[in-house]
Amino acid sequence: MNKIFASALMAVAMLGSVSEAEACSNFIVGKKASVDGSVMCSYSADDYGMFQYLCHYPAAKHAKGEMRKIFDWDSNKYHGEIPEAAETYNVIGNINEWQVTIGETTYGGREEMVDSTGIMDYGSLIYVALQRSKTAREAIKVMTTLANTYGYNSGGETFTICDPNEAWIMEMMGKGAGSKGAVWVALRIPDDAICAHANQSRIGKFNMKDKKNVMYAKDVVSFARSKGWFKGKDADFSWKMAYAKPDFSGRRFCDARAWAMLNHFYDMSPYLDWALGKNPDAQDMPLWVVPNKKVSVKDVENVMRDHYESTPLSVADGSDIGGGIWEMPYRPTPLMYKVDGKQYFNERPVSTQQTGFVFVSQMRSWLPREIGGVFWFANDDANMAAFTPVYCSMTERPECYNTPGVDAVHFSKKNAYWVCNMTSNMVYPRYSLMFPTLKEVRDSLDNSYFAAQAGVEKKAQELYAQNPQAAVKYLNGYSVEKAQQMLARWNQLFEFMVVKYNDMIIKPTDKNGTFKKTPYGLGATPVRPGYPEKFAKQLVKQSGDKFLVPEEKK
């Protein structure tokens, strides 16, 4: 989703209005880089006002001549229609029945390359490709063919495209209004490597002779050369330098997130200067690295909860007053603001309040495909929600992820997005005070799903050996049950926290979480925590003697 450019923000501010753009983060793990041989990828869809169900496209057969209407994924604007494929596959969320998974982040790039007359936007490319592809390579072919045939009506995009055996990163841009074409390049991520992208083009130079691991448009270089954007030899061509050269915002708000994600598993300190964005001569960071340990699903979930902890970019250490009294690792937006005519900015971490949904997709080649693909899904900021398991063969959605009559402006306690958001929005301003309670429940749920996974899948395989549909039905029921249990637990959590932290106090509980009472049946005396010491010192430094209690003479 769309990258925030500093120049764009300044231009919009001068016009007197500000529109907050979208932004996302992706993390990718090759099968030899994971603890169990899974290919994994993650995606957080971050956009203010975004409300997203767990989408579902049932498998289907289509008659010759049947057409599919294309609506823009961001705006819901009608673009046109394309012929349906003879057969389409089951899709739940961003994974299909063959375990193919696609995510994205938008970097924008050169505005003149957008084809406003094209039919296919980036979101439509994703979901049409999922319905038509059995492998990542096939998805790349479907997406690029659609863009070239019907036109690409979006800005520059980075796609994560994975299956149980391979992980790919592809970048695409249109060729301008009326072009009905796209330039693109796709690279296979080494099996032993990890990769990340976050709204800044990441592909630089690539080996055009490596036909096994590199795919690209025939005119990927010549098109840039024809526009005067590149003048060197083909071997020296850099995608991002030609089509989306990194600027300060692209590095500090976007590449810094990719830097932080990779930093969980590899020493990225040599590239800190690049992430900080201020030194034009800083060393660019690699597209992928080999991790210093094998990566698990739980690890990837934690990556998506990152706030630059333990790094110079941290927004979680209370080192400035931006986080408020209780050290909230979130900041208000827009990212840029002015004081006395000077431009300032907030950090933009991976975990952010405007997340509509987030997933970690786990794809495994050694299991029957109906069992091998697990789409770990959460309907809010990853830090503030538990990821429930959704199997790729699922054909029935939990009510909490598909609640009738509920959307971005209609609330329901039956809906996961709204229940998670009402809880997280209560916690944000009192983060250090309240978050430990939320985290305890979140981690308990996450760990319970991991603990149950082997047993659930063993039973599913036993059923599969007798009747594959019985296994699918079982996994459907399990996925629905866990999602609905999560919703019930989160509603309980919200009610508990309203009582426990009412009026900025803490009501005492016993080891079982039951509120203590006096011998006479009243609530026990609450604790009044006051200011955290760090904030109290900041307040005194800022206010001087204003609140100093005078010493009284005895």
Give short role names for the model-derived ranges.
Residues 17-23:
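Sec/Tat signal peptide C-region and signal peptidase I cleavage site
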Residues 24-122, 142-295:
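A contiguous strand-loop segment
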Residues 1-8:
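Bacterial N-terminal signal peptides that target proteins for export
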Residues 225-374, 378:
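Glycine-rich, aromatic-lined ligand/substrate-binding cores of catalytic
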Residues 325-463:
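Substrate-recognition/cap regions that form aromatic- and gly/pro-loop-enriched pockets
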Residues 10-17:
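Hydrophobic core
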Residues 443-554:
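Histidine-centered catalytic/metal-binding microenvironments
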